[in-house]
């Protein structure tokens, strides 16, 4: 049943003008389209107001800002045919044309990436995200500046846009967008979700993931309240879970854009990041066990070590990008039809698990990640794992030789 069918009242064309904390109820003041002022009492107030950040402003919640990238974007009236950007027959045949038409496509280079996103109505969103350490952000103050930047860094795409002469529907820019409110879930019965509470980075498009995580945690907290339980400890636990995911994503993107020009290392990073995302908390979430404290306790060591291993590997990728010479990788590395470690982790997301099976799957996934990390060191640096940054984190793992073979095949087309 929909929320409306369950008796939820939806007030359309209204604007919240004030929220006052109270016990047992908060007071919410809002105005309607006609200008009338109304008040209502609410035991819980949940802020999904996005960039308006109503509760952060009303309750003066401090926000922590991290090193941030800069973005500019615009929409054009028309469909961009990504296949028209190349005449390379091998590249054109790599995936069906419709796949590129329906998907987000990325163009990447040192310190930046460009998105091409098909929208409804045959419109297209085009965006540029840069690390200010590599690109002067004032270039993106205007649409003309962004076009000039594209001409320099993505001349093939810039020439394509020029030849099509699309009508530009709008232009936006944003910097300093990485932040997290210092309080997201309160025992005073208010909570923040979506970008009203935090935002990481657009790379990997994690926004809806964090919305889903926050909403799941909020529903758990409301359930605790309805059951008559105190909220201090559950709120603290929810905060810790959310922040762990947030900080993990920050480590994935912060100071990482410089890697993009190194084909070998960014390929390794993409394979690692995807496999990691599907191996632990993501697997538990897809099995509706994200807030199951019993299962969380049984895999707590694995989840903790996954997080530490991931953070360490991000440091390793940065080091490799400056110390390891680039070399060609196979052109169809990501769009690969060979069964491999990443695909197995992804398939497990949609496989129903009993509690015991889920615990065992998380443990197997951690061992596979250890095997992947060790295989990366062997393949990229030819370095003894005992002399590496990850030696302690992978201690006691059981090596899976098939992971090493699959990695070699994915990167170089050589499974030996």
Region spans (language model):
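Predominantly flavin-linked oxidoreductase catalytic cores and closely associated redox partners
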Residues: 4-157, 215
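Solvent-exposed, non-transmembrane amphipathic alpha-helical segments
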Residues: 19, 65-66, 75, 92, ...
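Context-gated lysine
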Residues: 21, 57, 64-67, 79, ...
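Flavin (FAD/FMN)-binding glycine-rich loop and adjacent Rossmann-like elements that form
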Residues: 77-122, 128-133, 185, 241, ...
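FAD/FMN-dependent oxidoreductases across multiple families
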Residues: 110-112, 118, 122, 134-260
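C-terminal helical "tail/cap" subdomain of flavin- and related membrane-associated enzymes
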Residues: 221-416
